[in-house]
Regions:
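Conserved nucleotide-binding/hydrolysis micro-motifs of P-loop NTPases
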Residues: 12-13, 37-42, 69, 82-86, ...
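A short beta-strand element within the Helicase C-terminal
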Residues: 246-248, 253-269, 275
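Interdomain helical connector at the RecA1-RecA2 junction of SF1/SF2 helicase-like NTPases
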Residues: 45-148, 163-169, 175-178
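Conserved C-terminal RecA-like helicase domain
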Residues: 114-248
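Short secondary-structure boundary/capping segments
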Residues: 21-23, 46-53, 93-94, 166-171, ...
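SF2 helicase catalytic motif II
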Residues: 1-33
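Short glycine-/polar-rich loops that comprise or flank the Walker A/P-loop
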Residues: 2-3, 27-31, 59, 70-76, ...
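Structural recognition of the conserved hydrophobic beta-strand(s) that form the central parallel beta-sheet
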Residues: 31-36, 247-248
Length: 276
């Protein structure tokens, strides 16, 4: 019946695959209206083609400028942080040979066999340490004076725990310069950082590979279940500095409302609906 009107929220996510096909087949004559802040236009996923009349795009548009004007959101400002460890995706093999020259031969070959990828390059320990230091120095200048907080977006779950360790060490070293005892500084720095990521079925499995076993142990140590994640997000939105940072890779990138979050440090390519 054409009397049916279907309102689809977050329509870029649900209507291209089975759910959308079943819904259209069930209500073939219904009028569909889609709502999204991040429409997608790709060969295999086209929000405009799914919901718009031929040759049209939006029926109505309420953009970021409108939301800022109405004070529904705040302006988004982008600042590039170029370093010697910036990654050009076209030169991944060259960067691998240059950056991993001091890594033991067996470990370097193991990485090469897995495939030299953007993620492998991004997780170089020296690169992570340098960026963690840059994040902390920037955070002290921009966020800390006004008790603002920040997210760090890493490329994957492994890089989350790598960033946590590097940032904890940087913060602890700074606290020790201010006279705090080492054990207290390390503990305090650890409490200033929370990691939010999804669990994998592989996390609890033993491995004969020492690197994989260590990674799984780190992921297990810093994983937050549903209650732990709720508590971390509540504390993050609160006034204290524990935590001051949320480190994520996929979660909390969109739809997470925290007025005291001032900066999102991006070390992951984000595109289309993953960006806003």
């Amino acid at each position: 019946s054409e009397d049916w009107i279907v309102l689809v929220d977050e329509c870029h996510r649900t209507q291209e695959k089975d759910l959308g096909a079943f819904l259209s087949a069930t209500l073939p004559n219904a009028r569909f209206f889609g709502f999204t802040g991040t429409p997608i236009k790709k060969a295999d996923k086209d929000t405009y083609a799914r919901f718009s009349e031929p040759g049209e795009t939006y029926l109505d548009k309420y953009g970021i400028d409108d939301a800022v004007r109405d004070k529904a959101t705040v302006p988004i400002l982008y600042e590039g942080r170029k370093t010697d460890w910036s990654i050009n995706e076209a030169e991944i093999d060259i960067l691998f040979d240059r950056w991993f020259v001091d890594v033991p031969d067996d470990k370097r070959e193991k990485l090469r066999k897995k495939g030299v990828s953007l993620a492998v390059i991004a997780k170089h320990p020296g690169r992570i340490r340098l960026i963690a230091l840059d994040i902390w120095e920037h955070f002290k200048q921009v966020c800390r004076p006004d008790k603002y907080k920040a997210q760090i977006v890493a490329i994957d779950r492994e890089s989350i725990v790598l960033y946590r360790t590097a940032l904890r060490d940087v913060v602890a070293a700074d606290l020790m310069k201010d006279g705090m005892a080492e054990a207290e500084a390390v503990a305090k720095a650890g409490r200033m950082i929370a990691c939010v990521f999804s669990k994998s079925q592989e996390d609890n499995k033993p491995s004969e590979d020492a690197d994989i076993a260590d990674l799984r142990a780190e992921l297990e140590a810093h994983f937050l279940d549903d209650e732990g994640e709720k508590a971390a997000k509540k504390a993050f939105k609160g006034g204290g500095d524990e935590p001051s940072f949320l480190i994520v890779c996929d979660k909390l990138l969109t739809g997470f409302d925290s007025p005291n979050e001032h900066v999102m440090y991006l070390d992951k390519p984000l595109r289309e609906h993953g960006l806003l």
